[in-house]
Amino acid sequence: MSAKETIEKLQNARIITALVTPFKENGQINFGAFPKLIEDLLANHTEGLILAGTTAESPTLTHDEELAIFAAVNKIVDGRIPLIAGVGTNDTRDSVEFVKEVAELGYIDAGLAVTPYYNKPSQEGIYQHFKAIATASDLPIILYNIPGRVVTEIQVETILRLAELENVIAIKECTNTDNLAYLIEKLPKDFLVYTGEDGLAFHTKALGGQGVISVASHILGQEFFEMFAEIDQGSIQKAAAIQRKILPKINALFSVTSPAPIKTVLNAKGYEVGGLRLPLVACTTEESKIILEKIGN
């Protein structure tokens, strides 16, 4: 699929869920938990899926496990919504080889590539890293700027430079409204700007961005859908009221390191997503109680 075709497909994907990875008690992937979870997400307005991203605990997944997840989810989704695969690491060579492998699958619509973590590259190093990934195959690439987890930030000037590459089509921006507003204003109109911060979904859409790549949409997809619909109709005050209503729930989902809270909630709702792989740990009994009280029914 060409960059242009993927952009067209993503035009209808405003609410993209960063999918959790279900685990069994022995720590192996629980593939049997995917069908119900995914079907319910689609029924509640998930319009795209991120596979093997941060919420999926990608640092503790092997590439073989990631490929198995891609295949399993693709079989369930069957072309109904776009699939975006996490393809980036802090090793450029490894990322290049993996994006080539993912591109050959034929059913992944785009790759999500995170800023290199731990290495602390310069802006030129960041640019060259993403350029190597974007030019390694014909798989369109979405930049992932999340300095809160990786320390290093892709500066807005570097993002504008990367946007000139034909195969770089979008960004998951996890910084602030100032950067979001600047990027939405300065980037090409067909370049898709998503926030990766659930609490900024309203701001991003109201500023003219594409939407949200979300953790909270596992349980708040309907609310995001209604909020975006109000914005599209020019009813900013009604949209803002929805934002204010869901914000305490969003905050609860990030009260301890994600994805522990969302897994707590999903398990409570019967989705059998299990625990987390070390070094991440599940919420404590007290943390779970507080989170579930704030989420409600």
Curated annotation (Swiss-Prot):
Q: Which HAMAP family match?
A: DapA
| Catalytic residues (positions) | 144, 172
What function does this protein fulfil?
A: Catalyzes the condensation of (S)-aspartate-beta-semialdehyde [(S)-ASA] and pyruvate to 4-hydroxy-tetrahydrodipicolinate (HTPA).
Q: Which reaction does it catalyse?
A: L-aspartate 4-semialdehyde + pyruvate = (2S,4S)-4-hydroxy-2,3,4,5-tetrahydrodipicolinate + H2O + H(+)
Q: Which organism is it from?
A: Lactococcus lactis subsp. lactis (strain IL1403)
This one is known as 4-hydroxy-tetrahydrodipicolinate synthase
Q: Where is this site: Part of a proton relay during catalysis?
A: 54, 118
The record's top EC class is lyase
State the compartments where it is located: Cytoplasm
Q: In which pathway does it act?
A: Amino-acid biosynthesis; L-lysine biosynthesis via DAP pathway; (S)-tetrahydrodipicolinate from L-aspartate: step 3/4
Q: Which NCBIfam families match?
A: dapA
Domain of life, per lineage: Bacteria
